[in-house]
Amino acid sequence: MEIEGSAVTQAQRWSWCRVASGMAGLLLLLSGVAVQPAVAGGATEAMKSTIDEVLKIVQDKELKQPGRADERRKRLEQVVGDRFDYQEMSRRALGAPWNTLSDKDKQEFVGLFQTLLTGSYADKVEAYSGEGVQYLNERTEKDFAEVRTKVLTGKTEIPLDYRLLNKGTDWRVYDVVVDGVSLVSNYRGQFSKILRSSTFADLLDQLHKKSDKIKAP
């Protein structure tokens, strides 16, 4: 089984689920025009802070100059990486097998999974067209929060929600839900299917091949 990007059944929403497989792309969506203020809350404010940083980089005319694409990408990856908890996402996506891994295997898996998630990054930057976003509300329960938004593009409205975990000093994203489809759950289903008939080493091999394709010029 080949590892794929996130997907939903409606073809109309395919591109948005592709965005869900690129973390920077997701943030770029939210850097559009906010048509409704977000409900006040720590998690929402954390997302706003990251979104503002992303928007600043995306709109920087100097970084749009030929030859500076790699620099812009690295800056965006840094900003997104500060908000998204790739290790927590990896742990949840892999499920129970995570607890059996060595620290070395965990580190390798996180790095490969992060590359997979950010694989469609460049395309999302180029495709960004200033979609509007409606901020709906924030729901919190102890150390967990969900910031609910809706992307407005033409006549289509697509629910886009961020699930965050309070890490003590900041809120970090551990899942993204596009039109009711959890990114983490989607990958957990794929990984579980692979591991039912193959070894963890086989899964890593597939991730390495996918990563090499993503990094290829």
Locate the predicted segments by residue.
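N-terminal secretory signal peptides that target proteins for export/translocation
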Residues: 1-17
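Sec-dependent N-terminal signal peptides
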Residues: 17-27
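C-terminal segment of classical bacterial N-terminal signal peptides
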Residues: 28-37
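Short hydrophobic alpha-helices and adjacent helix-cap/hinge residues
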Residues: 39, 58-62, 195-196, 202-204
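Early exported N-terminus immediately downstream of N-terminal targeting peptides
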Residues: 42-117, 121
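Surface-exposed, charged secondary-structure patches
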Residues: 119-158, 210-217
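Short beta-strand edge/turn micro-motifs at domain boundaries
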Residues: 157-185
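Low-complexity, intrinsically disordered terminal/linker segments enriched in charged
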Residues: 178-217
